[in-house]
Amino acid sequence: MGKVIGIDLGTTNSCVAVMDGKTPKVIENAEGMRTTPSIVAFSDDGERLVGQPAKRQAVTNPERTIFAVKRLIGRRYDDPTVEKDKQLVPYKIAKAGNGDAWVEADGKTYSPSQISAFTLQKMKETAEAHLGQKVDQAVITVPAYFNDAQRQATKDAGKIAGLEVLRIINEPTAAALAYGLDKSKAGTIAVYDLGGGTFDVSVLEIGDGVFEVKSTNGDTFLGGEDFDMRLVNYLADEFQKEQGINLRNDKLALQRLKEAAEKAKIELSSTTQTEINLPFITADQSGPKHLTMKLTRAKFEALVDDLVQKTIEPCRKALKDAGLTAGEIGEVVLVGGMTRMPKVQEVVKQLFGKEPHKGVNPDEVVAIGAAIQAGVLQGDVKDVLLLDVTPLSLGIETLGGVFTRIIDRNTTIPTKKSQVFSTAEDNQNAVTIRVFQGEREMAADNKILGQFDLMGIPPAPRGMPQIEVTFDIDANGIVNVSAKDKATGKEQQIRIQASGGLSEADIEKMVKDAEANAAEDKKRREAVDAKNQADSLVHSTEKALTEHGSKIEESERRAIEDAVSDLKEALKGDDAEAIKAKTNTLAQASMKLGEAMYKQQAEADAAKDAAKDDVVDAEFTEVDDDKKSA
């Protein structure tokens, strides 16, 4: 078994690590950096750039430089958060055929999974160059609050990159593994993870090598990108006030602003004032314009204060779900580059009543945790048990479209729970079990994961049959849902992967289409099947006529040609029955042609057998190699 690597696939930066004996090690990329920008660009000559080379040319190539694609992964195009992103990025976000949000470059569309896969490929190559061997297995981290579709899309990205994803683990859990691996002291910790695009908070109990997640919460659309955009908008507004020019209309200027905003944000974590200097940012009739501005830490903190405050409520919810007070948390571990910001550290200190722990590298700790988990799966790391939780409730749709929870959020996995339901109508002989994930009270407001039918329920008054629905989630997050009629013992089940399986978009489309057009779907499918069969028969018959038409009677040949013409005419329409009838007619008519072909084949085989009888035997003498070379 080759090495299993751990990858932190981040919104802004990605990182790869591997177990070196008993120690996790972060691997430097080809540019000598320990983290790689999660940026993919397409150059004029069609070359694909990933990481630092892509970031370097972003200013001159804004429309073909894709960044922060993790914010789109597993999301629908009409999602309000995607709508918000469309206003902020210089590249084009397009609507895919299945309704998902994709990106466009050079007239070609890419799914967020594909773009993420290019970054994962870079991580894979980085690890292979370091290890000197092929790598095809990985543990990849995701925000704890990612839903099923987002986890599946991340797994798909791994597959596209040529990696078998052995496990998807939550970023705060990975950070806790890295933090607590060498700690002998038991305790309760909170992991506060504010990254480039997402925010997570998890409460864990650590002791004797057991890492047990008690609760998790977060916001999958809150991170460093939002802080950058606040500053970009402020700079654009100030410039417009001074010069009367809106820089947002100039994609090249917008990209320069973004780069300057990110640099200023980083500098203000260690200094109280910075200067933004962008010469020749734009021009008008009077000549070139320059942007020069001093920015204080206080001003920046005022601009982003509400974003920092948005992290407080998820922390409170996580504490409440864990049944703990802030005072009962022994240590707060900071993860993600944004936690270097003094204002963030101040808010964390106020909330938990203690100085946060800064002993881990916030950019690398998640990848290190992923490598440790890879080591556990590989058997290199002993005596470590990771007990994670399901971040969102799982349940089914019941009468009136209500979402009935069977497994609550923050339940430790693996787990198995059952509940008994009944029929809604008299003499109902089948029930449809629709499986959902989420926290809303109505099923339609949550994410659908799949559906299946339990048939053959004996006729009985409504409310009498007893149908037991069981949810079973294993340590991989794989969900099995079964429904059993207690009277007959009949059982039906569906297997859904909480970090795999069908994507939400595909299922949603299938379910909605099937509900609205069940009969139409059947008719359309039959027509397509009939057309395919007919097309194939027309093609093979015409080919056979060309090759063997001379071997049959003229009247038989004409009958076949007429049947072909009739079927071609029928194929112009969508009447499945007419196409089937004409297909049968052609099949019958062309039987004579088939007979002629088989007859010819039989004659050819007989001739071959006769020829074999005339084969002359010959003797061969083996020549020794040594003699040959002598």
UniProtKB/Swiss-Prot annotation:
InterPro entries according to UniProt: ATPase_NBD, Chaperone_DnaK, Heat_shock_70_CS, HSP70_C_sf, HSP70_peptide-bd_sf, Hsp_70_fam
Keyword Phosphoprotein: yes
Entry superkingdom: Bacteria
Induction statement: By stress conditions e.g. heat shock.
Keyword Chaperone: yes
Disulfide bond sites: none
Disordered: annotated span: 516-558
Modified sites of kind Phosphothreonine: 198
Keywords: ATP-binding, Chaperone, Nucleotide-binding, Phosphoprotein, Stress response
GO molecular function: ATP binding; ATP-dependent protein folding chaperone; unfolded protein binding
Bias (Basic and acidic residues): 516-529, 540-558
Function: Acts as a chaperone.
Similarity comment: Belongs to the heat shock protein 70 family.
Name this polypeptide is given: Chaperone protein DnaK
Record gene name: dnaK
